[in-house]
């Protein structure tokens, strides 16, 4: 059963192991069912897999922004982490 965004935010807050970032990053990247469950909540269809692979810390903060439905904050977080939003598409790009 898919979780709501709020439930996902809570789950990641309670299960975060920021001392072992690589292990946690791998967990998020491999948890496609959970990531896929987020997609219906994203008004513009942003891809969270790219964000999770880029930086797990920003992914966690992004989940919190999603729970608050703060679109400008989401854009700021993604921009700060080197991810740019292609308006009118369902994908993210990465700055190289």
Task: Write out the residue ranges for each language-model feature.
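Short glycine-rich, basic-tinged beta-strand/loop micro-motifs
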Residues: 47-66
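Long, contiguous N-terminal structural blocks used for assembly/anchoring
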Residues: 1-47
